[in-house]
A protein has these predicted regions:
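Membrane engagement elements in two modes
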Residues: 1-55, 150-162
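Short, solvent-exposed loop/turn segments enriched in Ser/Thr/Gly
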Residues: 52-59, 131-133
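Intrinsically disordered, low-complexity Pro/Gly/Ser/Thr-rich segments with frequent PxxP/GP/PP motifs
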Residues: 83-123
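Asparagine-centered strand-capping/turn motif at beta-strand->loop junctions
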Residues: 48, 60-66
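Hydrophobic core residues within well-ordered beta-strands of beta-rich domains
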Residues: 54-56, 75, 110, 139
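Short, hydrophobic/aromatic beta-strand segments
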Residues: 68-76, 87-90
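Beta-strand signatures of extracellular beta-sandwich domains
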Residues: 76-80, 142
Length: 162
């Protein structure tokens, strides 16, 4: 192979690497916008209660103060009532394709609902009865939210009280 051919191959490899570096750099420009997400625990409401298990609807109000449009594939959280850990929950749309998820436009906010299952055996009868009788009004959710745009993904920790 002649010198001219080797230079052409090397130039093509360098060009491909430069193109890949440019794509990675362009994708990282969204990270700052994605990390500006705000999560507010909007509501915890009883949906149904049984003898040993109760289901609650946990509503998060997700706000987008940036100009970028993004989606939320995951909110993983721990729910506390009166400083007692009730358990962990997870809102997830990971199995839904990106275009099918709820889009949060720049400056917008979207309520996202999740079913939280409370087991009597994990929290004790006293807390369980207070929860199903709607006698607890102080809730705290803390965890991690994942935001995603076409080019980028960001994980942000949050804590919210209601």
């Amino acid at each position: 192979m002649g010198l001219q051919s080797k230079l052409t191959v090397y130039a093509a490899i360098v060009g491909c690497l430069a193109l890949m570096g440019g794509i990675v750099y362009y994708a990282s420009l969204d990270n700052v916008s994605l990390e500006q997400v705000e999560v507010e625990l909007a509501n915890v409401a009883l949906r149904e209660a049984g003898e040993d298990e109760a289901k609650f609807v946990v509503t998060f109000l997700v706000k987008n103060p940036s100009e970028k449009t993004y989606v939320v594939p995951v909110i993983a959280y721990q729910l506390y009532a009166n400083d007692v850990l009730l358990g962990s929950g997870k809102y997830s749309t990971e199995d839904v394709a990106l275009p099918g998820r709820a889009q949060i436009f720049g400056g917008g906010e979207v309520p996202l609902k999740n079913t939280f299952i409370l087991n009597k055996s994990e929290v004790g009868s006293e807390i369980y009865q207070l929860m199903i009788n709607n006698e607890i009004t102080n809730f705290v959710a803390e965890g991690m939210i994942i935001t995603q745009s076409t080019w980028s993904v960001a994980e942000t920790e949050f804590r919210s009280e209601k």
